[in-house]
Amino acid sequence: MDRGRRFVSYRAIEEAWLDDILATMEDGVGCFMVEAAWVLRHYLERHPEHANALRGYAQAGRFELLGSGENIIDVNMVHGELMARNLILGTLWGEHVLGVRPTTGWHGDGFGSSAQMPQVLRECGYQWIPAISYSHPDAPYWRGLDGATVLFNIPERFTETSGSHASCFRKHPPCPACQGHGCAICQDRGFDPNRAELDNPPMARTAAAAIVCGLWGEEILPGERVTAAIAALNATNGELHFRHGVYRDLYPFLAQELAQVDAPPAELVSSRVENNPTQCGCWVSRIRCKQEHRKTEHLVLAAEVWDTLLNAGAQADTLRTLWKTLTFSAFHDAITATHIDAAHEELMDLLGAVQHTATQLLSDACTRHVDHAITSVTLFNHHAFPSSAPVTVTVPGDWAGARVTAGDMALPVFETLNDGEVTLVTFAAPSVPGLGATTVTLSPAPARQTPVHDHTITHAGYTIDAGEHGITRIAVEELGAVVDGRDFLFGELVLEVDEGDPWGTRTYNHDRERCAPFTTLTGIEALGDSVVLRYAGAHPVNFQPFSLNAKITYLDWTQNFILRTGIPWLEVETTVGWYTQDYRLRLAFPSATRANRGVYEIPYGVLERDRYEATGTHLGAANGDWPAIHWAGIQTPGYTFAVFNQGTPSYRVEDGTVLVSVLRSPVAPCCLLEPASYVAHNYYGMMDNGTHTFHHALYLGAGDWRDNAVVRQAAIFNCGLTVVPGALSSSLPEWKLQAAHTLLSTIKPAEDGRGIVVRLVEHAGRPEIVRLRVPATLTSAVTANLLEDPLVPLTRDGDDLLVPMGAWKIVTVRIA
């Protein structure tokens, strides 16, 4: 309640919109479109009585479900599998419910678009996408990373205009008669509607073959007098003929463009494979949205693989629901943080619920193959390549230290923590086979914890110089010095002025303050087979409580730099107490280069991008960062300098330093406070005040990123091994992938329930033929598109399926 007014879910507006649409459709000529399957599905769950009418309208060409998928999601911060699954699930659901497969792609209001979107669109049957936001292809055809091409927007021989004077962004204020409680005047809805009537029509013929007149906008209800307005215009306007329509009606006029979509003239192809950057603040604001979403995605992926392989896909329906729910977390006003506090809390609850369910499904599948054993655990590897990673296990009892073995092999043990009742043991897993499992045994041992007094540390292949205020130099065996402190110390916190809103930075003032002078080395210690360097610091304002600093209230931090035997990366754990306004916090990872070109992992691919500076101060202007998923870094002549992240996707490569943005504190409530419609001060959470913890790692891969293990290691860093109490009791089904640079995206039951689907992605831009070994009971294998329509039978070589992988291709294999 706000001054006697009432707030309701946005779903109430969606329901009113669809109710009104269906009422106007009864005139026999009205047409309408819905952007996303999510909206329509939830409406039909509440109103199944309208399903037949909607199906009839769709088949009559009067209703079109557009091809954004389940939701219009952000496609820069999500796993490639979610980018694909969003469109797959929305398209198949639309076809099932409406009897018509959606064919018009849609990404309206999405904040940028990724380089593998054209391939995903084409694999789902879409050749045309008339809406992309807010950065666009610079030519009519958009060709993606793999060469797949789609037609963008409406060709020049058409004119597109708004046919309504209604504000596209005006919210629905409370009904003035009842202040939101519902009455006869507002049809018991509680709000004063904003409707899109046809009150701004074009009146004269132009050179265009057709004029597309849009009647839509955010939170705008359908007009009630559109059909009457069309009839009146046709009766009085001799130059133009008006009619209701949907995008499908334009396909006959697009025949020429669509006929050449696979081989358009070179001058008509956009010069860029992605439509970024834009709305850069969205990659940092409310950072927990990104962190928790990343964690949840990987949990669902692991659960799906093991439920399919070990539990015969028994939970396929539940997992499909989890994927659909994840598309809501990935929605372009959800993961992007462009929402109010209540919405943020709802999203955190949603992700927590998905994590809980996925964890239970994962445990249920894996425990089918283990026996109870108090001092043993089994490590399951859902990746298709051998994997080792730090693992933490809880054992009963109060252990001072621990010994961990895999067979006769002793494993590195890093830390043993206890509270008198249970002990947490962290150790390095052995190399667990891809899609396999290994049992390890734990037993008590003496504690191994000693302080280290030398400030030059050599451990796990790294040599580190620990200065009083930060790490000044890092060298690696066979590569030499890979970090220097010319501009920043390694992992240093950098405070940067960032005046703006959740969407982005709105000024050119990006002044920085280094935090190394306020940082102090607090200790170095050897914890078992690891070495931990500890630093802590605080901003000077913390010690001046009675001084006035309008922008920094309180800021402190601790950092642990962890070297682990058997683990190829240097971990950086940063905890920040953040109470600022109009600032951005970056972590600096300086290399030994002066590079301004970076390498960035994107959903289902990798791009090399150049440094750029801020492009403006308008809403959505880019501020100098690029989006990445698991890692970004610098390719040197001899090695890849990569910085892994766990849900902090905003990077900038500047004069040889990889800068990772981890926090923002925007103050401007753009689009979140709209007094003309309502007053609700429920947006202060956008400043992210509180304590935050971030996990990063430095990885050095010899040679080129296309050939070394950087992509695989970053995947392990984000989602390692599944730990299940007990010893392996039976062998796992034999699944094996032999590939140089092709990764497994998922293994899942087919959507139609007939067989198993394996999705692979080539991640280096180098074609190869991979070998896929499956259980002997599975005898049929064909490639398929993303919608799982069969394409080409696969050749066998002995026990292996031979799967051709084109450069950057996503290949789906159906096996039965």
How should these model regions be labeled?
Residues 1-81, 85, 94, 123, ...:
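N-terminal catalytic cores of secreted or lumenal carbohydrate-active enzymes
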